[in-house]
Amino acid sequence: MIKLGIIMDPISSIKIKKDTSFSIMLEAQKRNYFLYYIEMKDIYYEVGEVYANSYLISVKYDEKKWYSFKKKYTINLKELDVILMRKDPPFDIEFLYITYILEHIENFGVLIINKPKSLRDYNEKISTLSFKYSPKTLISCSKKAIYSFQEKFGDIILKPINKMGGDSVFYVKKNDPNVSVIIDQLTNYGNSFCLIQEYIKEILNGDRRIIMINGSPLPYCLVRIPNDKEIRGNLAAGASFDILPLRKIDYEISNNISSFLKDKGLIFVGLDIIGNYLTEINITSPTGINEIESVYKVSISGILLDSIEKLLNIKH
Protein backbone atom coordinates (compact mmCIF):
# COMPACT_ATOMS: atom_id res chain seq x y z
CA MET A 1 0.00 0.00 0.00
CA ILE A 2 1.44 3.38 -1.02
CA LYS A 3 2.00 5.94 1.71
CA LEU A 4 1.48 9.45 0.31
CA GLY A 5 2.14 12.66 2.19
CA ILE A 6 0.71 15.91 0.89
CA ILE A 7 2.10 19.24 2.08
CA MET A 8 -0.47 21.96 1.47
CA ASP A 9 -2.16 25.06 2.80
CA PRO A 10 -4.86 24.52 5.45
CA ILE A 11 -7.45 22.13 4.04
CA SER A 12 -10.15 23.85 6.10
CA SER A 13 -10.02 26.89 3.79
CA ILE A 14 -9.95 25.28 0.33
CA LYS A 15 -12.72 25.41 -2.30
CA ILE A 16 -13.17 21.77 -3.23
CA LYS A 17 -14.70 22.52 -6.65
CA LYS A 18 -11.45 24.18 -7.74
CA ASP A 19 -8.75 22.67 -5.58
CA THR A 20 -6.28 20.46 -7.43
CA SER A 21 -4.73 19.06 -4.24
CA PHE A 22 -8.16 17.90 -3.09
CA SER A 23 -8.77 16.15 -6.42
CA ILE A 24 -5.46 14.32 -6.10
CA MET A 25 -6.36 13.25 -2.56
CA LEU A 26 -9.73 11.89 -3.71
CA GLU A 27 -8.03 9.80 -6.40
CA ALA A 28 -5.35 8.57 -3.98
CA GLN A 29 -8.07 7.53 -1.53
CA LYS A 30 -9.86 5.57 -4.29
CA ARG A 31 -6.62 3.64 -4.74
CA ASN A 32 -6.48 2.87 -1.01
CA TYR A 33 -3.34 4.91 -0.40
CA PHE A 34 -2.46 5.82 3.17
CA LEU A 35 -2.99 9.57 2.98
CA TYR A 36 -1.04 11.88 5.31
CA TYR A 37 -2.01 15.54 5.51
CA ILE A 38 0.87 17.86 6.43
CA GLU A 39 1.20 21.61 6.80
CA MET A 40 4.61 23.13 6.16
CA LYS A 41 4.89 24.60 9.66
CA ASP A 42 4.58 21.09 11.16
CA ILE A 43 7.75 19.71 9.53
CA TYR A 44 11.02 19.64 11.43
CA TYR A 45 14.55 18.26 11.15
CA GLU A 46 16.20 16.61 14.15
CA VAL A 47 19.56 14.83 14.29
CA GLY A 48 19.61 13.49 10.75
CA GLU A 49 15.89 12.72 10.52
CA VAL A 50 12.91 14.69 9.21
CA TYR A 51 9.57 14.46 10.99
CA ALA A 52 6.11 15.95 10.62
CA ASN A 53 3.16 16.31 12.93
CA SER A 54 0.67 14.94 10.43
CA TYR A 55 -2.85 13.57 10.20
CA LEU A 56 -4.05 10.41 8.54
CA ILE A 57 -6.92 11.94 6.61
CA SER A 58 -10.02 10.85 4.71
CA VAL A 59 -11.75 13.08 2.15
CA LYS A 60 -15.09 13.17 0.37
CA TYR A 61 -16.80 15.45 -2.13
CA ASP A 62 -19.10 17.22 0.29
CA GLU A 63 -19.06 21.02 0.41
CA LYS A 64 -20.12 21.05 4.07
CA LYS A 65 -17.65 18.49 5.43
CA TRP A 66 -14.99 17.45 2.93
CA TYR A 67 -12.37 15.98 5.25
CA SER A 68 -11.92 14.24 8.56
CA PHE A 69 -8.78 13.53 10.52
CA LYS A 70 -8.64 9.86 11.45
CA LYS A 71 -5.51 9.90 13.57
CA LYS A 72 -2.67 12.27 14.44
CA TYR A 73 0.85 11.00 13.80
CA THR A 74 4.33 12.27 14.34
CA ILE A 75 5.77 10.53 11.31
CA ASN A 76 9.34 10.13 10.14
CA LEU A 77 8.99 11.30 6.55
CA LYS A 78 11.42 8.67 5.27
CA GLU A 79 8.63 6.14 5.97
CA LEU A 80 6.56 7.65 3.15
CA ASP A 81 6.77 6.46 -0.44
CA VAL A 82 5.95 9.79 -2.04
CA ILE A 83 5.45 13.38 -0.92
CA LEU A 84 3.55 15.96 -2.93
CA MET A 85 4.77 19.49 -2.19
CA ARG A 86 1.62 21.52 -2.85
CA LYS A 87 2.19 24.66 -0.75
CA ASP A 88 1.08 27.72 -2.69
CA PRO A 89 3.41 30.68 -3.31
CA PRO A 90 4.72 33.13 -2.28
CA PHE A 91 8.13 31.54 -2.53
CA ASP A 92 9.47 33.15 0.64
CA ILE A 93 12.36 32.33 2.96
CA GLU A 94 10.32 29.65 4.78
CA PHE A 95 9.56 27.95 1.46
CA LEU A 96 13.28 28.05 0.67
CA TYR A 97 14.16 26.43 4.00
CA ILE A 98 11.65 23.62 3.49
CA THR A 99 13.24 22.69 0.15
CA TYR A 100 16.53 22.05 1.97
CA ILE A 101 14.79 19.93 4.60
CA LEU A 102 12.83 17.91 2.03
CA GLU A 103 15.94 17.38 -0.06
CA HIS A 104 17.41 15.48 2.86
CA ILE A 105 14.57 12.92 2.67
CA GLU A 106 15.41 12.07 -0.94
CA ASN A 107 18.55 10.40 0.39
CA PHE A 108 16.25 7.72 1.87
CA GLY A 109 14.57 7.00 -1.47
CA VAL A 110 11.40 9.03 -0.94
CA LEU A 111 9.95 10.41 -4.19
CA ILE A 112 9.18 14.11 -3.81
CA ILE A 113 7.07 15.92 -6.38
CA ASN A 114 8.24 18.31 -7.45
CA LYS A 115 11.94 17.82 -6.73
CA PRO A 116 12.97 20.20 -3.90
CA LYS A 117 16.21 21.33 -5.54
CA SER A 118 14.33 22.23 -8.71
CA LEU A 119 11.65 24.09 -6.75
CA ARG A 120 14.50 26.12 -5.32
CA ASP A 121 16.48 26.56 -8.54
CA TYR A 122 13.78 27.40 -11.08
CA ASN A 123 11.62 30.43 -10.41
CA GLU A 124 8.28 30.08 -12.18
CA LYS A 125 8.61 33.36 -14.06
CA ILE A 126 12.38 33.59 -14.58
CA SER A 127 12.84 29.99 -15.75
CA THR A 128 11.03 30.77 -19.00
CA LEU A 129 13.97 32.93 -20.07
CA SER A 130 16.01 29.80 -20.83
CA PHE A 131 13.71 29.06 -23.76
CA LYS A 132 13.26 30.83 -27.08
CA TYR A 133 9.52 31.23 -26.53
CA SER A 134 9.86 33.81 -23.77
CA PRO A 135 8.53 37.33 -24.48
CA LYS A 136 10.87 40.32 -24.31
CA THR A 137 11.67 40.66 -20.63
CA LEU A 138 13.43 42.94 -18.17
CA ILE A 139 14.21 42.04 -14.54
CA SER A 140 15.20 45.11 -12.58
CA CYS A 141 14.55 47.30 -9.56
CA SER A 142 15.65 50.44 -11.43
CA LYS A 143 12.97 52.94 -12.42
CA LYS A 144 15.30 54.32 -15.10
CA ALA A 145 15.76 50.85 -16.64
CA ILE A 146 12.00 50.25 -16.64
CA TYR A 147 11.34 53.60 -18.32
CA SER A 148 13.95 52.74 -20.96
CA PHE A 149 12.38 49.31 -21.57
CA GLN A 150 8.97 50.91 -22.01
CA GLU A 151 10.39 53.42 -24.49
CA LYS A 152 11.67 50.53 -26.60
CA PHE A 153 8.65 48.23 -26.44
CA GLY A 154 5.61 50.38 -25.66
CA ASP A 155 2.89 48.95 -23.43
CA ILE A 156 4.28 46.70 -20.70
CA ILE A 157 3.25 44.29 -17.96
CA LEU A 158 4.86 44.61 -14.52
CA LYS A 159 4.62 41.84 -11.94
CA PRO A 160 6.33 40.61 -8.78
CA ILE A 161 8.60 37.60 -9.13
CA ASN A 162 7.35 35.48 -6.23
CA LYS A 163 3.55 35.75 -6.20
CA MET A 164 0.63 33.93 -7.85
CA GLY A 165 -2.93 34.29 -9.09
CA GLY A 166 -2.38 37.63 -10.82
CA ASP A 167 -1.52 39.31 -7.50
CA SER A 168 0.03 42.79 -8.07
CA VAL A 169 0.16 42.44 -11.86
CA PHE A 170 -0.08 45.79 -13.68
CA TYR A 171 -0.68 46.71 -17.31
CA VAL A 172 1.03 50.03 -18.04
CA LYS A 173 0.43 51.86 -21.29
CA LYS A 174 2.95 54.26 -22.73
CA ASN A 175 2.62 57.69 -21.04
CA ASP A 176 0.48 56.23 -18.23
CA PRO A 177 0.53 58.90 -15.47
CA ASN A 178 0.54 56.18 -12.78
CA VAL A 179 3.67 54.40 -13.97
CA SER A 180 5.96 56.00 -11.39
CA VAL A 181 3.87 54.99 -8.37
CA ILE A 182 3.37 51.47 -9.77
CA ILE A 183 7.13 51.04 -10.15
CA ASP A 184 7.70 52.36 -6.63
CA GLN A 185 5.17 49.90 -5.24
CA LEU A 186 6.52 46.84 -7.06
CA THR A 187 10.20 47.60 -6.51
CA ASN A 188 9.80 48.85 -2.94
CA TYR A 189 11.28 52.17 -4.05
CA GLY A 190 14.11 50.63 -6.01
CA ASN A 191 15.04 47.90 -3.51
CA SER A 192 13.23 44.82 -4.87
CA PHE A 193 13.41 43.17 -8.27
CA CYS A 194 10.31 42.89 -10.41
CA LEU A 195 9.66 41.39 -13.82
CA ILE A 196 8.67 43.54 -16.79
CA GLN A 197 7.52 42.14 -20.11
CA GLU A 198 6.22 43.48 -23.37
CA TYR A 199 2.42 43.51 -23.49
CA ILE A 200 1.12 40.58 -25.55
CA LYS A 201 -2.18 41.62 -27.12
CA GLU A 202 -3.23 37.97 -27.53
CA ILE A 203 -4.02 37.96 -23.80
CA LEU A 204 -7.47 39.21 -24.85
CA ASN A 205 -8.01 35.75 -26.39
CA GLY A 206 -6.93 34.05 -23.18
CA ASP A 207 -3.99 32.71 -21.20
CA ARG A 208 -3.57 28.98 -21.89
CA ARG A 209 -2.71 26.63 -18.99
CA ILE A 210 -1.18 23.39 -20.28
CA ILE A 211 -0.77 20.55 -17.80
CA MET A 212 2.44 18.52 -18.14
CA ILE A 213 2.77 15.15 -16.38
CA ASN A 214 6.27 13.66 -16.43
CA GLY A 215 7.11 15.67 -19.55
CA SER A 216 3.95 14.88 -21.53
CA PRO A 217 1.24 17.49 -22.21
CA LEU A 218 -2.44 16.74 -21.83
CA PRO A 219 -4.20 17.25 -25.19
CA TYR A 220 -6.66 19.82 -23.79
CA CYS A 221 -5.83 23.04 -21.97
CA LEU A 222 -7.54 25.54 -19.70
CA VAL A 223 -7.96 28.90 -21.47
CA ARG A 224 -8.46 31.72 -18.95
CA ILE A 225 -10.09 34.74 -20.56
CA PRO A 226 -9.82 38.14 -18.84
CA ASN A 227 -13.04 40.00 -18.19
CA ASP A 228 -13.71 43.27 -20.02
CA LYS A 229 -11.96 45.43 -17.43
CA GLU A 230 -8.92 43.21 -16.90
CA ILE A 231 -5.77 41.99 -18.62
CA ARG A 232 -5.07 39.25 -16.07
CA GLY A 233 -5.93 35.76 -17.26
CA ASN A 234 -6.29 34.39 -13.75
CA LEU A 235 -9.43 32.74 -12.40
CA ALA A 236 -8.58 34.26 -9.02
CA ALA A 237 -8.77 37.68 -10.71
CA GLY A 238 -12.23 37.07 -12.18
CA ALA A 239 -11.36 35.54 -15.55
CA SER A 240 -13.78 33.17 -17.26
CA PHE A 241 -12.55 29.96 -18.85
CA ASP A 242 -12.88 27.61 -21.77
CA ILE A 243 -11.37 24.20 -22.49
CA LEU A 244 -9.72 23.84 -25.90
CA PRO A 245 -7.46 21.34 -27.66
CA LEU A 246 -3.78 22.17 -27.87
CA ARG A 247 -2.58 24.07 -30.93
CA LYS A 248 0.48 23.22 -32.97
CA ILE A 249 2.52 25.91 -31.16
CA ASP A 250 1.38 24.55 -27.77
CA TYR A 251 2.75 21.12 -28.66
CA GLU A 252 5.93 22.68 -30.01
CA ILE A 253 6.58 24.58 -26.77
CA SER A 254 5.63 21.58 -24.60
CA ASN A 255 7.85 19.18 -26.52
CA ASN A 256 10.72 21.66 -26.52
CA ILE A 257 10.89 21.80 -22.73
CA SER A 258 9.79 18.22 -21.99
CA SER A 259 13.28 16.79 -21.48
CA PHE A 260 14.24 19.72 -19.24
CA LEU A 261 11.25 19.05 -16.97
CA LYS A 262 11.95 15.32 -16.74
CA ASP A 263 15.67 15.82 -16.14
CA LYS A 264 14.95 18.21 -13.27
CA GLY A 265 12.35 16.00 -11.58
CA LEU A 266 9.51 18.39 -12.40
CA ILE A 267 6.77 15.80 -12.74
CA PHE A 268 3.62 17.91 -12.34
CA VAL A 269 3.82 21.26 -14.12
CA GLY A 270 1.53 23.92 -15.56
CA LEU A 271 2.76 25.92 -18.55
CA ASP A 272 1.24 29.35 -19.15
CA ILE A 273 1.17 30.42 -22.80
CA ILE A 274 -0.13 33.70 -24.24
CA GLY A 275 -0.27 33.75 -28.02
CA ASN A 276 2.98 32.08 -29.06
CA TYR A 277 4.86 33.01 -25.88
CA LEU A 278 5.71 30.97 -22.79
CA THR A 279 5.13 33.29 -19.83
CA GLU A 280 5.39 30.99 -16.78
CA ILE A 281 6.41 27.45 -15.84
CA ASN A 282 4.32 26.69 -12.75
CA ILE A 283 6.05 24.10 -10.59
CA THR A 284 5.11 24.86 -6.97
CA SER A 285 1.43 23.89 -6.94
CA PRO A 286 -0.02 23.92 -10.47
CA THR A 287 -3.80 24.07 -10.72
CA GLY A 288 -6.47 23.85 -13.40
CA ILE A 289 -7.24 20.13 -13.54
CA ASN A 290 -10.79 20.48 -12.18
CA GLU A 291 -11.77 22.93 -14.91
CA ILE A 292 -10.24 20.75 -17.63
CA GLU A 293 -11.95 17.62 -16.27
CA SER A 294 -15.32 19.40 -16.37
CA VAL A 295 -15.15 19.21 -20.19
CA TYR A 296 -12.41 16.72 -21.07
CA LYS A 297 -13.75 13.57 -19.45
CA VAL A 298 -10.61 12.01 -18.06
CA SER A 299 -9.11 11.79 -14.57
CA ILE A 300 -6.01 13.97 -14.64
CA SER A 301 -5.34 13.02 -11.02
CA GLY A 302 -5.48 9.41 -12.20
CA ILE A 303 -2.92 10.09 -14.94
CA LEU A 304 -0.67 11.78 -12.37
CA LEU A 305 -0.92 8.91 -9.88
CA ASP A 306 -0.36 6.35 -12.66
CA SER A 307 2.84 8.20 -13.47
CA ILE A 308 3.85 8.32 -9.81
CA GLU A 309 3.26 4.58 -9.44
CA LYS A 310 5.49 3.90 -12.45
CA LEU A 311 8.20 6.11 -10.99
CA LEU A 312 7.95 4.29 -7.65
CA ASN A 313 8.30 0.94 -9.42
CA ILE A 314 11.41 2.22 -11.18
CA LYS A 315 12.87 3.50 -7.90
CA HIS A 316 12.17 0.26 -6.02
UniProtKB/Swiss-Prot annotation:
This is Glutathione synthetase. It comes from the Bacteria. GO terms for cellular component: cytoplasm. The keyword DNA-binding does not apply. Residues 123-309 form the ATP-grasp domain. Pathway: Sulfur metabolism; glutathione biosynthesis; glutathione from L-cysteine and L-glutamate: step 2/2. Belongs to the prokaryotic GSH synthase family. It holds the Pfam family GSH-S_N.
